[in-house]
Structure formats: C-alpha cells, structure tokens
C-alpha cells in the first residue's frame, strides 16, 4: 500500500492511539507523580509515533531504521512503565491488560514495518540497526 504521509502508516496510527490511552490513564495518577512517572511515561509514549513520523521522510534505509529503532526502544520503556504503574496500584488489572495488549499490537506492527523496510532495501546490510 502506497502512503502519502506518516499518518497513513498503521504503525503510526496504533502508536498514536497508545499515546492517547497513556494520557487518559496517567491523568488519574497521584498528583505527586505529575513530574515523575506520569511525565516519563507520557514522554516515552509520545516518542514512539514521533520517531515513526520522523523516520518516514528519511531517504536512506539506515536513517529510517535508526528512527524506528529509537521508537522500539521507547516502546520497551513504556512496557516497563505499564508494569510499574500496575505494581504501584495506579491502574487496575483490566486497564493493565488493555494497555499491555495495545502495546503488543504496536510492537508487532512496528517490527513488521522495520522488516518491510529491510526487505525493500535490496540487500543492504542494516540488520544491526533493528
């Protein structure tokens, strides 16, 4: 499927939906977490679709994959924040499971997007970047 802008990417769409869910959830965190976990969680979540968007216009495969790799790192950071938020009692088990499932969907689509870029790179050796 041909894309015209980063918003057409399923990886970006799912990552953006995850950001909205994180903002909704973290708005209920205790006030003392506003500049702690809340801020860190939101920044890491925003980094996922932001880096997908930034990598979208990069011309070289290595450049694209670098930004997608940063997005993957931020995704893993969020995976920890989901666990920490649950363990601190800031979300119930239903919210935890919903967010964990959503995060896993983002991960799978993002990994597929990276594989697609690698497969279209015509043999360039960029596998070390993902």
Description of each model-found segment:
Residues 1-54, 58-130:
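Short, C-terminally biased terminal segments at protein or domain edges
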């Amino acid at each position: 499927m041909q894309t015209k802008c980063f918003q057409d990417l399923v990886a970006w769409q799912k990552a953006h939906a995850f950001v909205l869910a994180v903002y909704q959830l973290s708005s209920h965190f205790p006030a003392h977490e506003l500049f702690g976990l809340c801020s860190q969680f939101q920044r890491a979540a925003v980094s996922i679709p932001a880096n997908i968007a930034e990598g979208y216009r990069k011309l070289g495969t290595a450049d694209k994959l670098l930004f997608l790799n940063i997005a993957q790192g931020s995704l893993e950071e969020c995976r920890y924040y989901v666990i920490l938020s649950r363990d601190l009692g800031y979300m119930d088990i239903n919210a935890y499971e919903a967010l964990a499932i959503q995060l896993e969907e983002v991960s799978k689509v993002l990994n597929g997007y990276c594989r697609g870029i690698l497969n279209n790179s015509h043999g360039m050796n960029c596998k070390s970047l993902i």
